[in-house]
């Protein structure tokens, strides 16, 4: 205080950004999906586990950590509190005690204070900042305690509190306390001493916390209306609430000024670009760029704090970073609260948030106390400035920044009086609305942001109530997909009905309706593309329902269920496990999230006359790899150009990026009716590309027995539906290219170890290609990859034929067959991919610089050097090891029997030939009574014996083939058992032991069943053979 009285500049205080993390409970959608918690917390440390790999664990430590996931209950007032004394649950009061009080302390001392809420959409940012119902968040609690403290000190100081609320969307600033919107948004100006500020932003003087609470409600309503009209989700905008707090100490002629900024940042998943690398318009949206630039600023400041050389801090790259310049690396005490989802399906986003917070805590600020000892001189100068209408105020002392914002409004008392008059008018409107809520049925808006749900109420008066885009309608909606005359609600005889007009899209409880439909209390209604409302019936129909369960997710899940979309459609739990696969759940969540976005994109395409139809698909929904295992599923969007039939496939990330750009173009169209854009900048256009249509699986077991294979196999698309039929031949051959015959068939594939194998893959034809039926100008190519080839081989393009003949052969050679290659042939399929060509697209073709060729010019396979697997001691899985040894001995015995039977077959063949050429009297067969039939009988028996011999050989070959296939699987399981190591985490030992026990049991069952099956088959074959070896009639 002495230095302040002497007029000296206060000494800056260096502080690091304080970082807190908070883990929310499961959402209803996550509960319904059976999500698992992947986060644990100990003191201030957060540990996150990869749901796909339990051994991959990462730990982070922060200044503050709050566990709000479980261990809570509601008290009689609806406040969430710990369920028992041992619970580690942190409620709203705990968060405020550490963070909110810190903000207040800084403000009273004269420091600027900033609070940033960061996290993915739905992670609980708004709940921590504002809260819901009785569980008030940081912002209302800060305001309440600020005015309570002012009241206690009103005798010794004069306190002035001013409030503003703004939104940043697409690099435009909207004043949420002003009902008029400036064209292009408010502008950010820069002053040499003041830094960046928003020109023309409305500041409202406040004298109690109730007034601020109502201003927040007013701002939320304007924000909701604006986002509806602009088709802009609030999750993609930043909301900034600012409080200017000025203390005038009456006894010391001293002032302290503090700026409190509380920012609810846009959903952090929006900045991620992974998966959109192939998009030529990558990061084209300014919505994406603002959070990306914020990350760049934080990274640069973190590097600076660590002593690295940083040439430039990119504050000027976005509106958001300009306004947060003082909060990050400047004159402010800053806290960042990172909101986390604990669900396994949100693992990637949660890990990204933790890493972001880890960088932020390295940023260092230099906060100073904002004081001015010359308050009287300041007021005199301010009066002089007001005489000039406030012109040139920005060029004067920084001590007058608050007065500069006031402009010509007059004294503080006059400002308060003006605010009271405005408040009284708003209060009368709010009171009238609250009275109507009690007596009239109405529609309650439901938004993706829970903070904006219930902000809009549309009352359905007696008679007919029209809904549409036109201003003459009783309910005017400017949102996407709303017609001028969209639908009508009728309130008559105690019943409310809804009837869509000809072009109006109306969905009730997930189902589209086309005729007048009676509404029941709590019915869910979607108008147009995605304007969601909850119908609140007459007072007599209402009860003590929990309206919170009808959230945005509920609407979308209901809509998906009506369209037949469910987790079961994507695949259920793993065998022996009741829990659904986390990757399947994540795909399902992505599908639900993208559903409304695709509907909106189609509507924009229609209104902008772009002629695109977008459909949500699941990549690899019914696809498998060469071993028959399911491929990783992901959501994609199929885009079709109506008229030209051009088709594109967009990844999830690419579609989201394009959707941002579509919104920008659509907004420009709404404002100026101009949607013209250069083709290369058009988010609705892409160059044509090659598309993957489907895959066919050709199993290679026959090659391991040197048997020819000729098949017609279906090409199945990602949904498991037939796209075409493949005619293919796989022929084992000699090094000269001659096909092997039956005499070259190998019963035991192990005989091929270390030997050379040659084979040819001949793709003959594709039949009934739907891609070509739809448009005769299209073409196809086929691609496949054999074992360890470094690249895929493609056939030549074939155009304009529904049944295109390919007729391409490739000769392959394995010079020394390895056990791994043999196992590949026994257990894998050749996956042939069908690719669709469009007019103007480039053909598929890959150079083969790494492919090895034999001296004859054939492609070499099985060229890898395999590392041997370490042997294990006999005491590791000893029982199975002994069984495997015994099984190998019995297998060798069966091979001996097989060799003896083959020798006997040769002898019988020779004896049969001798019997056919010997005189009739010398034949071993009994002479029949009919001499003429003797020759016929002998010949018939000879044919029968030959047929039986061939049948026995083929049956034995099949039996051994099945047995060796089972043994290959058993060897693979044994290798996996040998390679398994117990986890270091004690908590994972029980699942590990359970998994190992199950694997041992499966292997034991496989060995036992394979052996019994082989014994049974061989016994049956030997019995049948002996029956035909015995002389007939003896």
Swiss-Prot record:
GO BP terms in the entry: mitochondrion organization; organelle transport along microtubule; vesicle transport along microtubule
Protein's name in the database: Kinesin-like protein KIF28
Compartment(s) where it occurs, according to its Swiss-Prot or TrEMBL record: Mitochondrion membrane
Pfam families: FHA, KIF1B, Kinesin
Membrane topology (UniProt): Peripheral membrane protein
Record domain FHA: where: 465-528
A single GO cellular-component term on record: mitochondrial membrane
Gene Ontology MF terms in the entry: ATP binding; ATP hydrolysis activity; microtubule binding; microtubule motor activity
Protein family: Belongs to the TRAFAC class myosin-kinesin ATPase superfamily. Kinesin family.
Keyword terms of this UniProt record: ATP-binding, Coiled coil, Membrane, Mitochondrion, Motor protein, Nucleotide-binding, Transport
Organism of provenance: Rattus norvegicus (Rat)
Binding site for ATP: 119-126
Main location group: mitochondrion
PANTHER family referenced in this protein's UniProt entry, alphabetically: STAR-RELATED LIPID TRANSFER PROTEIN 9
UniProt keyword Cell membrane present: no
Function: Microtubule-dependent motor protein required for mitochondrion morphology and transport of mitochondria in neuronal cells.
Protein origin, superkingdom: Eukaryota
Keyword match Magnesium: no
Lineage of the species this protein comes from: Eukaryota, Metazoa, Chordata, Craniata, Vertebrata
InterPro entries named among the record's database cross-references: FHA_dom, Kinesin-like_KIF1-typ, Kinesin_motor_CS, Kinesin_motor_dom, Kinesin_motor_dom_sf, P-loop_NTPase, SMAD_FHA_dom_sf
Ranges in a coiled coil: 875-904, 994-1027
Limits of the Kinesin motor domain: 16-363
